[in-house]
Regions:
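Periplasmic polypeptide-binding modules associated with outer-membrane biogenesis and secretion
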Residues: 13-27, 33-250
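N-terminal signal peptide c-region/cleavage motif recognized by signal peptidases
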Residues: 7-10
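Sec-dependent signal peptide recognition
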Residues: 1-4
Length: 250
């Protein structure tokens, strides 16, 4: 009975709008359809869909660097399905002009950041793509966490767009602060043999913090099959100076 009810419900679900988007292809069309969302299945959602369509198309194109599109919307209120036709001319794109990327603090001398900033995913002259800028921003923060710059933060992040000129200036400054070191290693299991545990360590107190080493220690402990649960976590709130304690829960 439950299966029959589910099948009946699925069969009864029907859209109330027929949508057509023409004039654009590829990533532009894919992004527009993603911003528009699912075709509505109720009259109320249908009205909201139509009212917000232009703004969503504009936002979808701006995310890809197209700030002066021509959008024609035609709505036919036929029943049971309205017909919404959206014709789009994306127009000329905004292109990246100036790129100002700075790594400040101890990470300025870190080869890992040098490699990251040598290939940021876009160049001067490229069409502005907000997704690529955001992707690079996340990579900077992620690398900082992995390499031990746990107090690092982005202190400046902006895109200045001149629509009439068709240009965009990009700025991102990351202040890493100091690179922290491993502090005391705290084990909450008093039954484990200390020599056995020490033989599996992938770092020592005083070594530079590295997320990969934490993961390696956790993997080693898990592979012993001695413990039902293994959790290795940095104790950020208990850090003193440049040392961060590591808690090993077994």
């Amino acid at each position: 009975l439950l299966i029959l009810l589910l099948m009946s419900s699925a069969a009864g679900a029907t859209t109330t709008l027929k949508l057509s988007v023409v004039g654009i292809q590829g990533e532009q069309k894919k992004n527009v359809l993603a911003y528009l969302g699912a075709v509505p299945e109720s009259d109320e959602n249908r009205r909201n869909f139509v009212v917000s369509a232009r703004d969503k198309v504009e936002s979808a194109l701006q995310a890809l660097g197209y700030y002066q599109p021509e959008i024609e919307i035609d709505l036919q209120r036929t029943e049971p399905k309205w017909r919404l036709s959206i014709v789009v001319n994306a127009g000329e794109p905004v292109r990246v002009r100036d790129i100002n990327i700075q790594i400040l603090g101890a990470a300025a001398n870190d080869d890992n950041f040098t490699r990251l900033t040598s290939d940021i995913g876009f160049s001067s002259g490229d069409v502005l793509h907000h997704g690529r800028f955001e992707s690079f921003r996340k990579k900077v923060l992620s690398l900082g966490q992995r390499r031990g710059y746990l107090r690092g933060e982005i202190v400046a992040s902006r895109i200045e767009i001149e629509i009439d000129a068709g240009t965009a200036d990009v700025m991102l400054w990351y202040e890493s602060g100091p690179r922290l070191r491993f502090g005391e290693i705290i084990v909450d299991n008093t039954l484990i043999d200390s020599d056995l545990f020490d033989s599996m360590l992938t770092f020592q107190p005083g070594d530079y913090f590295d997320q990969v080493r934490l993961q390696q220690l956790q993997s080693r402990l898990q592979r012993t099959n001695y413990f039902s649960s293994v959790i290795v976590l940095p104790q950020r709130k208990r850090s003193l100076g440049d040392r961060i304690p590591i808690m090993v829960n077994l």
